[in-house]
Amino acid sequence: MYVDRLELDTVRELVDVTGKRVLEMGCGDGRFTFLYAEDAAYVLGIDPKRVEVREARRARAASLTKRVKFRVAKTIGPPRRRFDVALFSWSL
């Protein structure tokens, strides 16, 4: 989708995710998560909606299983892992 690619290009101008560990808050169905994964070393997408996370997991290509993970999260506490970049879009 053109708008998704436009947003990704804008994010790339502001933040370099190449080879980095990315936390995406409010990942929804993973459409941006998969775009970030083109460059990132690892992406964790979290969303409070179980149905969205389920869809994201279904859409994930087998080749991304180790580098892209999805979790249901109603609240956000301290992360268990370190991330280089945290992104939050389309979630307000």
Located regions from the model:
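Conserved alpha-helix/loop element of class I SAM-dependent methyltransferases that forms part
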Residues: 2-20
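A short beta-strand submotif of the Rossmann-like class I SAM-dependent methyltransferase core
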Residues: 88-91
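Conserved class I S-adenosyl-L-methionine
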Residues: 20-28
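Short gly/ser/thr-rich secondary-structure transition/capping motifs
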Residues: 2-6, 26, 70
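A short acidic, Gly/Pro-enriched loop at the edge of an enzyme's catalytic core
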Residues: 76-86
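A short, aliphatic-rich alpha-helical micro-motif
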Residues: 16-17, 37, 80
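Conserved acidic residues
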Residues: 20, 41, 84
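Class I SAM-dependent methyltransferase SAM/SAH-binding core
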Residues: 31-77
